Amino acid sequence: MDLAVSNEDSQILLKDKNVLQETVLDKYRTSGQITQTALKFVTDLINDVYHYKKVQTPLSISELCLMADSFIVNRLEQYYKHKVNERGIALPTMIDVDAVASGWCPEVDDTENIKKWNNNSDETSPFASSITGYLRHGDVVKISLGCHIDGYTSQVTHTMVIYPTDETNTKPTGPLLGSKADAVAASHIASESVTALLACSLTPEKLPQSLRNANTNSVTGHQIRSVVDTIAKAYNCAVVPGSRVRRIRRFLAGQNEGIVAEKDYKGVVWTEAHQEANLLANTEVQDIVVANNQNKLVASSAIPSDDFSVDVGEVYLIDLKFCPLTDCQKKGLITLETVDSYTGKSHKKNQLIARSGAYVRDYAQSYTLKLKTARQLLTKIDKNGVYPLKLSHLSTDFPLTEFTAEESDAVKKDLRSFRLGMNEITNNFLCVETPIQVAKWVPWDHILNSTNKNGALSYDASAALTLPGHEIPLPKLGISGIKLKSLMNSTNEVMTLPVARECSTVILCGSDVSVSGKPELFRLTGGSKTAQPSWVHSARELNPADPVVQGIFNLAELSKDKRFGLTMRETQPMKKNINLASDTTMEM
């Protein structure tokens, strides 16, 4: 939805406040340092509980999320106090396991509900860890979190593997093998390659020859897509829809995609439509009817396109998700299924049932609420700003300081009163649930052979967070979102696939603001020191004969060359951390 904003305000919000200068860079740097420290805090907790066995009582996923969010808020209290109007959590801590691609951040009072809703699932379910709330050996765990200071945002996602260990031997006996290893390796290599490619925009003369455009030396969206797709193909993986490499600006970090049409959107996104385009480009069948669906209601600058150049002084979010195709015996579509908590319908045995834990405020909607609890809750939500939030963040006992059971029980008590008010708020679209999404594989022959009477006229009202111009998943075939959802439930060939994900935030600093006095890429989050890749072994490798792969190898060499290569700097986590003792764990 387009908001009525004057040209003067638009100039201030989108241009003036995003000029990279010392004050802005310091806010980015501080938020990145807090995010890096929070990521290390969560990974250390998981290692202490599941690998080193230092904590006697295991911590559940909901407990880890609450503790990480509390850690971020406690850290933010130490910086820019009384100096900025807004600071806080930009992305609630999400711990997605295996096939859950994004959005898994359950509240502490939902642990038993999730078990009850999924009582027909067993240990063989791909969602067993998410349902029980505890991680298991072999799980591919994606940790996502972020914070902001005055709207300048840093986000991170890191994939780690849970290895089998015991008290006598805390080191894993071997690396992760198989299709999951392919996805983990591909996500790490792609993230590092795109980071190096963005760094080449600062010194275009260092851009590898095989990656150069015919007319210009600048880094474009087409090059970014080519590099990522080449790595995915080499590791027999698919880029999961929702992956993106996009520019972020003050208060515009991708959290409101689909709610507000962002002017001058700049980034590469991967959707089902790109898989459809590849299918039609490689097919020899001539009797497939394709449509020309164009959304004329949305400004063209708000629709993502690869036709852009990366410029100095911009901030980019690199968010890439991969799933392996080893178990897929024929061509198919990788799509995302939104999880819901409707218990009145018939569910398949291994279908996940859960309710969203995070919400986004839609300021374009207005409604006079009837319930007093809903009005009071909306007042608290409006103070939170434009970023996603959880109900636990609104509790008077949040953030937790000692991580005790008493603090957790106090948060649970507040949640009970909040849920009634949130029902009226969401029913009137004042807030939108952040969806929990699961990666699914659907065979193409099932899609092409299906009847589609309504074509693209059907509309999925539940798909609230959809990018402008991508409301129809398969526009050429005329397959709408609601039709694709029905196709996933109408065949037993549909498969659930594990997902690996890496996300980092980078700044392209010019010589006027860089520490070294020359252009450099400043990596706010991620990196080899804080987000060290897990021990995996993939049987696949990049093909050196491919010109794009040669460019990827050149990017890796430039990243390692400290003298003549690319100038890149990483934000380091804070040295002081919170150590969780076994006697201070929350018992729920």
UniProtKB/Swiss-Prot annotation:
Keywords: Cytoplasm, Hydrolase, Metal-binding, Metalloprotease, Nucleus, Protease. One of its GO terms (cellular component) is nucleoplasm. It is found in: Cytoplasm; Nucleus. GO terms for biological process: proteolysis; ribosomal large subunit export from nucleus. Probable metalloprotease involved in proper assembly of pre-ribosomal particles during the biogenesis of the 60S ribosomal subunit. Accompanies the pre-60S particles to the cytoplasm. Component of the nucleoplasmic and cytoplasmic pre-60S ribosomal particles. This is Probable metalloprotease ARX1. It comes from Candida glabrata (strain ATCC 2001 / BCRC 20586 / JCM 3761 / NBRC 0622 / NRRL Y-65 / CBS 138). The gene is ARX1.
